[in-house]
């Protein structure tokens, strides 16, 4: 809005500019921010912000966050971590002297579970945790599991 249209322009020449008697409109009459939340602003806080004051629950002093962090991956999705051109090479049988190495931690997974089917191609899997079913299926395919910390 242009300055020439503002209300303060219309108040020029009138002593208190619409703020009452001289000296009445002061800076922060109720305090700044949340001041007086338990005193003169209590009714507002009780109505619109219940539970703002006080404590809830107990503290956990030495809390270890992500203590049981173990994102899972099923073996049916295991080969999706191998690049497409390399996957074709291994599954077709062109590369028989080497096996792909999949490090689950570097892909953001910690635990390998055994849901799904696996192509009968040897594979080396590095993971923190491996279920018994996943271990059995990988070994049947001629693969190896390396547990890493």
Curated annotation (Swiss-Prot):
Q: InterPro entries in the record, alphabetically?
A: Ribosomal_uL15, Ribosomal_uL15/eL18, Ribosomal_uL15/eL18_sf, Ribosomal_uL15_CS
Q: Which GO terms describe its cellular component?
A: cytosolic large ribosomal subunit; nucleus
Where do Basic residues bias regions lie? 1-14, 21-30
Coarsely, its chief localization is cytoplasm
- Which keywords label this protein? Cytoplasm, Ribonucleoprotein, Ribosomal protein
* Any Pfam family the entry gives: Ribosomal_L27A
Drop me one GO molecular function for this one. structural constituent of ribosome
Subcellular location field:
Cytoplasm
Q: Does the keyword Ribosomal protein apply?
A: yes
**GO terms (BP aspect):** translation
Residue span of region Disordered: 1-43
Similarity comment: Belongs to the universal ribosomal protein uL15 family.
UniProt function note: Component of the ribosome, a large ribonucleoprotein complex responsible for the synthesis of proteins in the cell. The small ribosomal subunit (SSU) binds messenger RNAs (mRNAs) and translates the encoded message by selecting cognate aminoacyl-transfer RNA (tRNA) molecules. The large subunit (LSU) contains the ribosomal catalytic site termed the peptidyl transferase center (PTC), which catalyzes the formation of peptide bonds, thereby polymerizing the amino acids delivered by tRNAs into a polypeptide chain.
Quaternary context: Component of the large ribosomal subunit (LSU). Mature N.crassa ribosomes consist of a small (40S) and a large (60S) subunit. The 40S small subunit contains 1 molecule of ribosomal RNA (18S rRNA) and at least 32 different proteins. The large 60S subunit contains 3 rRNA molecules (26S, 5.8S and 5S rRNA) and at least 42 different proteins.
Q: Any idea what this protein is called? A: Large ribosomal subunit protein uL15
Biological source species: Neurospora crassa (strain ATCC 24698 / 74-OR23-1A / CBS 708.71 / DSM 1257 / FGSC 987)
């Amino acid at each position: 809005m242009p300055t020439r249209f503002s209300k303060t322009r219309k108040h020029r020449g009138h002593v208190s500019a619409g703020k009452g008697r001289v000296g009445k409109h002061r800076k922060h009459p109720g305090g700044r921010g949340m001041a007086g939340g338990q005193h003169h602003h209590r009714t507002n806080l009780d109505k619109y912000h219940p539970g703002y004051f006080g404590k809830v629950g107990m503290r956990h002093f030495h809390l270890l966050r992500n203590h049981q962090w173990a994102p899972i991956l099923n073996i049916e999705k295991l080969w999706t971590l191998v690049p497409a051109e390399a996957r074709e090479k291994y599954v077709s049988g062109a590369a028989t002297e080497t096996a792909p190495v999949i490090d689950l931690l570097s892909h953001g997974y910690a635990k390998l579970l055994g849901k799904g089917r696996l192509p009968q191609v040897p594979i080396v899997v590095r993971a923190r945790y491996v279920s018994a079913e996943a271990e059995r299926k990988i070994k049947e395919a001629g693969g190896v599991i390396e547990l890493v910390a």
